[in-house]
Amino acid sequence: MKNDVVRWSRQPTSNTTNSSSSSRSDSNSTHKHRSKSNKLNARQLGSNAARSCQQRSSVATTLEDEQQTIIECDIGNFNFDCNLFKTSFLTQHKQKRSGKSSSKSKSNRSRPLAKTKAVFLLALQFSAVVFLCNINVGFVAGSVATAASSAGGSSPAAPSSAPSSPPTVAVPPPPPPSSALKVDPNGQSPVLPPYVLDYETGGKAKLTPNNGKFGQSGSSGSNNNHIVGHYTHTWAVHIPNGDNGMADAVAKDHGFVNLGKIFDDHYHFAHHKVSKRSLSPATHHQTRLDDDDRVHWAKQQRAKSRSKRDFIRMRPSRTSSRAMSMVDAMSFNDSKWPQMWYLNRGGGLDMNVIPAWKMGITGKGVVVTILDDGLESDHPDIQDNYDPKASYDVNSHDDDPMPHYDMTDSNRHGTRCAGEVAATANNSFCAVGIAYGASVGGVRMLDGDVTDAVEARSLSLNPQHIDIYSASWGPDDDGKTVDGPGELASRAFIEGTTKGRGGKGSIFIWASGNGGREQDNCNCDGYTNSIWTLSISSATEEGHVPWYSEKCSSTLATTYSSGGQGEKQVVTTDLHHSCTVSHTGTSASAPLAAGIAALVLQSNQNLTWRDLQHIVVRTAKPANLKDPSWSRNGVGRRVSHSFGYGLMDAAEMVRVARNWKAVPEQQRCEINAPHVDKVIPPRTHITLQLTVNHCRSVNYLEHVQAKITLTSQRRGDIQLFLRSPANTSVTLLTPRIHDNSRSGFNQWPFMSVHTWGESPQGNWQLEIHNEGRYMAQITQWDMIFYGTETPAQPDDVANPSQSNQFNLYGNDMAHNDVEYDSTGQWRNMQQVGEVGMTRDHSNTAACLKWSDRKCLECNDSAYMFEDQCYDVCPVHTYPLDKFQAEEDEQDDEVTRGPVNPYSSSPMDHSLLMSNSLDDKQDPLQAEDRRRRSSLTQLVEVPSRVCAACDRSCLECYGALASQCSTCSPGSQLRKILNETFCYAYVVRSTGMASVVDISKMDDRDTQQYMTGTTVLLLVSVIFTLMGVAVAGGIVYHRRAMARSNELYSRVSLVPGDESDSDEDELFTAHFPARKSGVNIYRDEAPSEKIFEEDEISHLVP
């Protein structure tokens, strides 16, 4: 219970200070006063005090000024402790007890107002501080990252003012001293060659000595890109000459079991006394292996997260199960053959397998193995083609790859993939495999802990017997994972491509990934991003990009697979000797590609792994695949980030492979960009340039890698674009909305195949966009070029001037187009454009001359567009006659006017036009002028052609933005200055996904950005200062008011009698001030007085 409080209030006098000090001095003395004739006794006082518990009474006198002297006493426990103070908050005299205190009312009214002001000021200051933090916190992060990299041993970056030095060709680091490393008695290289990136160590521990061994035993090092799991009970051990029984002896001596050989001199050990899942390593067993002189290298394995790239069973399509074929279909009695639309549809709408079968090519003699969760080897549609030598159970360490059955059939994936490749034909059951004459095996490796050793052992299984390895799995497609093969798996790829198939190289085919819905990018998958694999994407039945498909520059080609609910899926074998028509995802695409590869290898057994990739690039069909990102590279090939070079064409690949000459030896050149230590501010981008003129051994590119080290507070905000000397634009990395990692990229090799056939000589540009709120910093950029010194084929014609200014009406490919009789199958096939737009359908009958599926000449009544003949120009194009093109050229000369002979560029006049005031007022007119000024002379224009409209037009009568006749949905025609443009209803910024061409930007964009940034910064500073000033004024005012009030001072109240036995003892207070009339009131009891006026005279003298 709270104590009762009574206040005695008296009118201040001129000697208030003296009275206060006198009261404080007299508080230490004891005064006795017993009131016998008083009407108030001690018992009554105690009773009144009990009734007034938790109440506050005050005594007030009439004020002549704004201040009062108040004594506050606590009487709840009969211990009169009083406080004497002055106050200026009670500004009115309390006339009667029933009235409310005006001071209390004013205080209650002022409190909400004060709280509102405080909240407003806090919100204002908080918003300003947050804005300033967003501007500046990234700089701190960048400084910390720089300091960390410097502390990590990296050399400090050269100052920006230093003169730029030419790029240097990377030289492999010198080998460690012989005293520090063990020497391989066979003279073989270490676990990984120096140029292979170790994904588990970020490239930092490839040749690090550790007690005389290669690599770090027992610790995988720091890897920001790889999320490792628990430790397992298995080890990977390198024992030279272990085949002669030494590996078994080492395992026995240290309590291990030798599970088998991974590849040359590398073995898979297990220790059954070590926990199969542990968060900490088994250091004791690791140390024993390290101390054994027979062991060259040892490492405890950690589990990895690997996902199959298919989906939950979807409902079968309600569309017709039989498609009209435009080629002569073969007769199969398999029950599901009519539903295999991707093989028998014809008309250029399938993968053209039937003509290859008619040539007698069925994959006979080629061995394909499926790396997955097992294979139902006794399936009626698989058992005739099952090959036990191509099969193994890595999870259970036996030769039987039969899957583990459960209630959900979760291990059906491998059996489905195997049926796509080699399901038996004409057995009256289920489906037909693409290579139905090939042998198929399966490796059960996903139904357990997947470690680096498990992957390496699977990829290295019987490489002299197995020709093709098909994998439809990889790191999690969640849009936030950056992961790839470990040290052993990377070595397995190299061993396979250099030694497999008798030195011709094993074929590794990989599914590109199903993270499209999560906006994942397959360049963050180290398996599809590898030069050793053939990455395959998917296309739907209608030729669209599937919703699950990932876009990246490492995808080489495409096969058909599932789409939406209304589109058909893939037919194949299933668990329990059954069949399915609903195989989905890129998991279904990779086995189809493996089957086509088996057909190609049968037609030419001497093909190497690089030969196959060259053939895929040259024969893939872009036709009928709808993707707005289609473009042409520097040698004229059409390529897409979703489909690669197009749909795989089995018959054409077989035809080319029969006459194929082996490509020259692969050459490699690495260029290190100097002084790369740049900060990328938020929502901006920078462009780095690297001049290449030292790679004389690589003149015809195959794979290109940009190895980048970059730090960022949020990795998903980074976009990367690469531009080749031939002006081919490549998107290396797209934004990933789920990637919140702060790890950045540590020597991650972003790979591209889009510059295939180009020359690396010239200027390469790397454009880095930071679309987030935090700073980013790039510290390393290396370019690695793979290719040949001479053309891939002897009859290929070199193209000395590479440019993507390709001829719109012909084919500028660098290789030799093989012409054949136009009466063949391609002469009768229909190349379909946009689905549902009959006016876009080409007219093959109007073509007079064919060359490799491309029309070279149309008749007089037809229009030519993109190597096809049309009766009417397709949508987004307009008819352009030869005389009209010449008139446009003349008009353009008049528009450009005289050229300054002293100008360094013929475009100076157009640049001046682009900086005019009208351009600032209307960007569409500016773009129109730029396009007018950039029109070049048309050379050898066919008589009737279709030219592309401006992208803002749906239909047009010219190439300019001001020549639209109809607009795309969401836009409307508006007339400005006697010209008509298509304006969008709502203009939205596309900065998050647009590619900004720095070469076409003028300085005013940068100036506007800097001006806007400065203004925002000044506004935030002004608001902050105003908030601080207002808050300071309030604090100062409050403190000034507090100084006008004296602090509480203790006044001792002592009993009137020293006797302790009298319970009715009355406590009184002695005041040295003169007696004056005092009224006493209690706030919460208006009908009752605690003290009468004449009674207080005994309390206050």
UniProtKB/Swiss-Prot annotation:
Report the cofactors.
Answer: Ca(2+)
Q: Give the disulfide map.
A: C430-C579, C522-C552, C669-C695
Q: Where is this region: Disordered?
A: 1-57, 150-187, 886-915
Record membrane topology: Multi-pass membrane protein
Please note every region of biased composition (Low complexity): 13-28, 150-163
- List where in the cell it is found: Golgi apparatus membrane
SUPFAM superfamilies tied to this protein: Galactose-binding domain-like, Growth factor receptor domain, Protease propeptides/inhibitors, Subtilisin-like
- Please write the reaction equations for the catalytic activity of this protein: Release of mature proteins from their proproteins by cleavage of -Arg-Xaa-Yaa-Arg-|-Zaa- bonds, where Xaa can be any amino acid and Yaa is Arg or Lys. Releases albumin, complement component C3 and von Willebrand factor from their respective precursors
One annotated Gene Ontology cellular component of this protein:
plasma membrane
Boundaries of every Peptidase S8 domain copy? 340-654
Going by the entry's taxonomy, the superkingdom of the source organism is recorded as: Eukaryota
Enzyme Commission code(s) on record = 3.4.21.75
Arranged from A to Z, the UniProt key words for this protein are: Cleavage on pair of basic residues, Disulfide bond, Glycoprotein, Golgi apparatus, Hydrolase, Membrane, Protease, Serine protease, Signal, Transmembrane, Transmembrane helix, Zymogen
Task: Give me the stretches of Pro residues compositional bias.
Answer: 164-178
- Record GO biological process: glutamate receptor clustering; peptide hormone processing; postsynaptic membrane organization; presynaptic membrane organization; synaptic target recognition
The organs and tissues expressing this protein are described as: In adults, isoform 1-CRR is expressed in CNS, fat body, and female reproductive tissues, and in embryos, in anal pads, hindgut, developing antennomaxillary complex, oenocytes, clipeolabrum, pharynx, trachea, CNS and developing posterior spiracles.
Enumerate the SMART domains for this protein: FU
Q: One Pfam family of this protein, by short name? A: S8_pro-domain
Q: Which family does it belong to?
A: Belongs to the peptidase S8 family. Furin subfamily.
> By what name is this protein known?
Furin-like protease 1, isoform 1-CRR
> Which gene produces this protein?
Fur1
